[in-house]
């Protein structure tokens, strides 16, 4: 899944390179309608049926369309947009919490039997991604600010999108990983 706006905020708070963070977020968001379904297909097509074009359309509806609508509203109705945008962080947070709660409710039985293992795996995945990215970027002679930014970008993804795609194209239990990741990436 592409990076989310949270990575831009975390980069700012960590005194990283915000311009680099925003650029990466824009690129991953624009590439996500093709890259995300391609990754789904490459990883899972032998195990389950993957409808590539359905995933493309879902990402366009959930990620790309809202971005363009937001830009359009901001351009055409700037005064109204400023009033609306004040509430968007709260609405986004409540929406993600509701999605996580629904996913957990749908998979409560399976979560109970594997929650610790799943939590450890998701934590290790996230920590390793952040640490390895930082180390490799430093070895490639990136400065500390850019290395910090890249590490944050790798460790912060649009987990809401991952949850929804898992619910629609996999199983409710698969969405649990996204729900756990949503919590872990914000710790």
Language-model-derived ranges and their functions:
Residues 1-187:
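Alpha-helical transmembrane segments of multi-pass small-molecule/ion transporters
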